[in-house]
UniProtKB/Swiss-Prot annotation:
Assigned protein family: Belongs to the GPI family.
GO molecular function, one term: carbohydrate derivative binding
Subunit structure: Homodimer; in the catalytically active form. Monomer in the secreted form.
Annotated binding of D-glucose 6-phosphate, by residue: G159, S160, S210, K211, T212, F213, T214, T215, Q354, E358, H389, K519
Keyword Isomerase on entry: yes
EC id: 5.3.1.9
InterPro entries in the cross-refs: G6P_Isomerase, G6P_Isomerase_C, Phosphoglucose_isomerase_CS, SIS_dom_sf, SIS_PGI_1, SIS_PGI_2
Record's protein name: Glucose-6-phosphate isomerase
Catalysed conversion reaction: alpha-D-glucose 6-phosphate = beta-D-fructose 6-phosphate
Length: 558
């Protein structure tokens, strides 16, 4: 594939940006086009409510959007999309298909990898998950003392933690009748210790999520949990009633003491950060019930079908991806804020930090050459309105442009005080995107200060600080209610956005070699931390840090 910067549509966009970007003004665009909202928004009518994607408050016009769509087409987005859904091994560095879409393929149409339809295997594991969830949630599955399970602990890291954690938090209102859920990921002993302190061994069930069953953090935490558990049960045979494996390594699972009957498998065509749809989502299904888990899958499948069948010009994941390309590759933006105005979605941005940054934090193209353009952004964010009292100052008046996605449900799960809280939340959501778009002109700020009775001297001093440039781009994503179906659709929306950007940048969004080097070095350093002998095998900084740690670790601090 030709370098992105040599692509003629990319160059047309560069020329347009050079000649026009200084003059594009959102206020003027809205004033000039009364239909701008209708022309630059999508109303997705799902079978479980609507998702409105309003992208009218972006620094684009119809000409720019058409050039961006032409760029996507010329970069092979449609072909790569079809290849992914068809089981082609588009993860070329690992020679793997990319088929998280198969896990939620509710239409059950065949998806073939290596001449074999994967859907029978997918359905078999889903049925096993359904049966297991029913047994645990009904109380039929008993612990070693005959008590039902009250607490589930998911032990995993990365994709085996972030997705299930985000979804179980987002869907708490649907967890009625389910066990409590806990997540342990960090190798820091504080995480497992503080979790175990809340639990009773005889009614706790541990899910150990590791494809290879060799992930250091996960297995170390699982062994600690087993040691704690056996301290109470004093019978190794009871491990089978309290530990479940999500893995493909049967021998390691048996070695740990888990009955292979209690092992739920998944496949190498499921990437970790796309795995919540697989057996890795068992903790989700146990918490909210399998029927609701299926609704999550159905919502994602709905978005898959929209992404696969809708022309690029009206395709929500594609349009969000192209707007990101516009800001990253032409405006030089380095970050993207995800700002959900729903407390249940408080882990949404953290989840897509991995989803986006591990996928598109790459600098080498499919042909093995270094890119000559920017790729994945830094993704961050917090729920509204908390963020308004923390970092919105920089978004409004800082020196960096930060494109933002604002997300909110029209209906709240908790309409307390006759909906007052949610009305205030909605008002703040709407006000922020309008304020970022419009800003406050010098004249408007001056009139405001005069109306407040400021003296000429105070007015002159305060005026520059009260001006807001505006022209800050945002997307507004408004949905009827945060249900399992809608959450599934929203997650898939962003997954496909990330995929489209990776195709345009000509990088592999489905490997993660960048996480390996640090892990390799940590294995070498770990034995060097034993004893008191000085270490000289590293650079002076690392040697000095090791020396300091050895000096300080036995000092008694009250």
């Amino acid at each position: 594939m030709t370098s992105l910067t040599q692509n003629r549509y990319f160059q047309k966009l560069q020329d347009w940006h050079r000649d026009n970007s200084a003059d594009i003004n959102l206020r003027s665009l809205f004033d000039a086009d009364p239909e701008r909202f209708n022309n630059f928004s999508l109303n997705l009518n799902t079978t479980h409510g609507h998702i409105l994607v309003d992208y009218s408050k972006n620094l684009v016009n119809k000409e720019v959007m058409q050039m961006l769509v032409d760029l996507a087409r010329s970069r092979g987005v449609e072909t790569m999309r079809d290849n992914m859904f068809s089981g082609v091994k588009i993860n070329y560095t690992e020679d793997r298909a990319v088929l998280h879409v198969a896990l939620r393929n509710r239409s059950n149409s065949p998806i073939v990898v290596d001449s074999r339809d994967v859907m029978p295997e997918v359905n078999r594991v889903l049925e096993k998950m359904r049966s297991f969830c029913q047994r645990v949630r009904s109380g039929e599955w008993k612990g070693y003392s005959g008590k039902p399970i009250t607490d589930i602990v998911n032990i995993g890291i990365g994709g085996s933690d972030l997705g299930p954690l985000m979804v179980t938090e987002a869907l708490k209102p649907y967890a009625s009748g389910g066990p409590r859920i806990w997540f342990v990921s960090n190798i820091d002993g504080t995480h497992i210790a503080k979790t175990l302190a809340n639990l009773t061994p005889e009614s706790s069930l541990f899910i150990v999520a590791s494809k290879t069953f060799t992930t250091q953090e996960t297995i170390t935490n699982a062994e600690t949990a087993k040691e704690w558990f056996l301290g109470a049960s004093r019978d190794p045979s009871t491990v089978a009633k309290h530990f479940i494996a999500l893995s493909t390594n049967t021998s390691k699972v048996k070695e740990f003491g888990i009955d292979p009957q209690n092992m739920f498998e998944f496949w190498d065509w499921v990437g970790g950060r796309y795995s919540l749809w697989s057996a890795i989502g068992l903790s989700i299904a146990l918490h909210i019930g399998f029927d609701n888990f299926e609704q999550l899958l159905s919502g994602a499948h709905w978005m898959d079908q929209h992404f696969r069948k809708t022309p690029l010009e009206k395709n929500a994941p594609v349009l969000l991806a192209l707007l990101g390309i516009w800001y990253i590759n032409f405006y030089g933006c380095e970050t993207h804020a995800l700002l959900p105005y729903d407390q249940y979605m408080h882990r949404f941005a953290a989840y897509f930090q991995q989803g986006d940054m591990e996928s598109n934090g790459k600098s080498i193209t499919r042909s093995g050459t270094r890119v000559d353009h920017h790729t994945g952004p830094i993704v961050w964010g917090e729920p509204g309105t908390n963020g308004q009292h923390a970092f919105y100052q920089l978004i409004h008046q800082g020196t960096k442009m930060i494109p933002c996605d604002f997300l909110i449900p029209v209906q709240t799960q908790h309409p307390i005080r006759k909906g007052l809280h949610h009305k205030i939340l909605l008002a703040n959501f709407l006000a922020q995107t309008e304020a970022l778009m419009k800003g406050k002109s010098n004249e408007e700020a001056k009139k405001e200060l005069q109306a407040a009775g400021k003296s000429p001297e105070d007015l002159e001093k305060l005026l520059p600080h009260k001006v807001f440039e505006g022209n800050r781009p945002t997307n507004s994503i408004v949905f009827t209610k945060l249900t399992p179906f809608i959450l599934g659709a929203l997650i898939a929306l962003y997954e496909h956005k990330i995929f489209v950007q990776g195709v345009i940048w000509d990088i592999n969004s489905f490997d993660q070699w960048g996480v390996e080097l640090g892990k390799q070095l940590a294995k070498n350093i770990e034995p060097e931390l034993d004893g008191s002998a000085p270490v000289t095998s590293h650079d002076s900084s690392t040697n000095g840090l090791i020396k300091f740690i050895k000096q300080q670790r036995d000092i008694r601090i009250e």
